[in-house]
Amino acid sequence: KKEIMAYTVRDLSNAQRFEYKGYEVFMYCVEDSFWSGERTYKVDISISDHIYYRIAEDIQIARYQQQRQSYFPTAYNSGYNGTYDIMKKLKERILFSSSFNIIVKRKFTILKDNEPYVRDAMGQIKSIIDSKFGNVDDRFKNIQNII
């Protein structure tokens, strides 16, 4: 009889997207049990696009500096063949993603108040990122050599 009581929230209206330390985090509620006061969030983590872009731009500028010292320098190109092309390659080489579930227990609060759940969930996610995934930039160490 228990499964009748617990209802599952399938719509993503309470999905949250935030960035933390260079990671893009997407979290959404997959189960919300009224009776136990527990809410389960599915969490997807990836490297945020602007990190890829920043690293790609650094590589592009470094290449341009090298080119300038050569006899026939090519023009600085920030178009598709430049930064975006490098960005695409970066994503292929360092495509990081992780998914996991976290459970947040309701504390004394208004029953349907979303805020405390989301706050607690974000707190948990941030500490998981701190302890488990480390610094985004470390993933791009020595990347110039392989691109």
Question: What function would you assign to each model-found segment?
Answer:
Residues I51-I55:
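Surface-exposed loop/edge segments in extracytoplasmic proteins
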Residues W35-V43, D49, E92-I102:
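Short aromatic-glycine-(Arg/Gly/Cys) micro-motifs in beta-strand/loop hairpins
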Residues K21, S48-D49:
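Short strand-turn-strand beta-turns centered on an Asx-Gly dipeptide
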Residues A56-I147:
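Mixed-charge, Lys/Arg-enriched low-complexity segments
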Residues I4-R39:
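Negatively charged, low-complexity tracts enriched in Asp/Glu with abundant Ser/Thr
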